[in-house]
A protein has these predicted regions:
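A short, N-terminal "cap"/entry segment at the start of jelly-roll beta-barrel domains
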Residues: 1-53
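N-terminal regulatory/effector-sensing and dimerization cores
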Residues: 40-120
Length: 120
């Protein structure tokens, strides 16, 4: 996999903003919030295999939101399958909640609003 983004060499006060831009560039238009944006760390590695994109992501605790405004831009129409290697991921979509922890995957639709709670 090729590293396409890292906060490592970015000034601490600018890391979270840069991370949000990277999410929008490499995934989907979203909003995100961090409890500690001045001490944010993350990286994104990516491989493209035909129509499938595989990525490895390390991210600090945060909440990610995709709403109707983002979807109206329809930058991508796809599904995401996430397999956390540590921590947990809570996905809220269509009135349902799914929790993913190491060893358990979660699937969600990018064409519908969602809220992801990413916890280390």
């Amino acid at each position: 996999m090729k590293n396409v983004f890292s906060t490592q060499n970015i000034e601490k006060t600018k890391r979270f903003s840069a991370w949000q831009e990277a999410l929008c560039e490499h995934y989907l238009k979203v909003d995100s919030r961090s409890q500690n944006p001045t001490d944010y760390e993350g990286f994104l590695n990516k491989s493209i295999l035909g129509p499938v994109i595989l990525s490895e992501v390390f991210l600090s605790t945060q909440d990610i939101f995709r709403n109707h405004h983002h979807i109206a831009l329809l930058d991508k129409d796809c599904f995401y399958i996430m397999f956390p290697s540590k921590g947990s991921l809570l996905v809220e979509q269509a009135g349902k909640q799914q929790v993913s922890t190491p060893g358990a995957a979660v699937l969600f639709d990018a064409a519908m609003p969602y809220h992801l709670q990413c916890r280390n």
